[in-house]
Amino acid sequence: MISVFDLFKIGIGPSSSHTVGPMVAANLFLDSLTKQTELTAITGIEIELYGSLAAPGKGHAAILLGLLGHAPSTIDTRLTSQYLSPIFSEKQLNIAGKHVIAFDTERDIHWYDETVLPYHPNALTIRVLLTDGSHYQQTYYSVGGGFVINEEDATNPDEDNATPTINVIPYPFNSAAELLEQCRQHNLSVSELVLANECHYRNQSEVFAYLDSIWESMQDCVTRGCQNSGILPGGLDVKRRAQALHLQLCAEKNQPITKNDKLAAMDWIDLYALAVNEENANGGNVVTAPTNG
């Protein structure tokens, strides 16, 4: 069963495959690296982007943020430029915030947009050079929705780990029809049944606390989107529109809304959707549902 902990993740825009995934991959690499060597033994680092990850161009900021030690769920996206500034101005990378090495994005990031690795088109390799002349590297695949697997798991899946967990949850289902049938048989609502499945792995307070954090992040995203103005990144000079629409709707708020005035409610729904869309395009914190797209 795919958990709500998997479906709804706090991430960074604009793409779960091209920003959240690579950032997670960098986090995983740091975890693996620290088990292999001391950070002080690192003399250099190289990044290779393949296929679809290389095709959009210089969208490497998410990987660099991950190597700095930032995670998609906790990074303050308002400070992204501040975090990245030393890399571009001083040509230095502070690995995990603990060890500074020389790093030149033009020299140390390699783009192979016409090379597609066997498992998935969204692939990257991170390699560190060590003081003894050796190196340590890992290849990762960003498979969508912020999910990442390493090359070892992709080429040699563990059959035990690959066994679906659907058989051990209280109310297994493989389709919406099966979900509704389980609800009918056990006299449960959809929300009650899903909660029971979630609580098979973690206690209810943990589930509710996580969902509260997701809801708070969603609300914050809408608020930021309604407040921020300017031009969206990407080079197309697209102007943000949510702030102006928000001001317009607020000016009309004293006008009575009748019970059947569905169009008035839709104006606010459209505003919230636009606000989130613009925050995502701007590289802000958003919630995957189940992807940024």
Named regions from a protein language model:
Residues 1-8, 12-13, 74-80:
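Conserved catalytic cysteine-centered active-site region
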Residues 8-28, 59, 281-292:
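Conserved phosphate/anionic-ligand binding catalytic regions in large, soluble enzymes, centered on
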Residues 12-55:
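Accessory carbohydrate-recognition regions in carbohydrate-active enzymes
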Residues 14-17, 21, 54-58, 75-76, ...:
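Catalytic cores of large soluble enzymes that bind and process phosphate-bearing ligands
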Residues 133, 141-145, 163-233:
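Phosphate-/polyanion-interacting regions in eukaryotic proteins
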Residues 204-292:
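Accessory "access/gating" subregions that flank catalytic or transport cores
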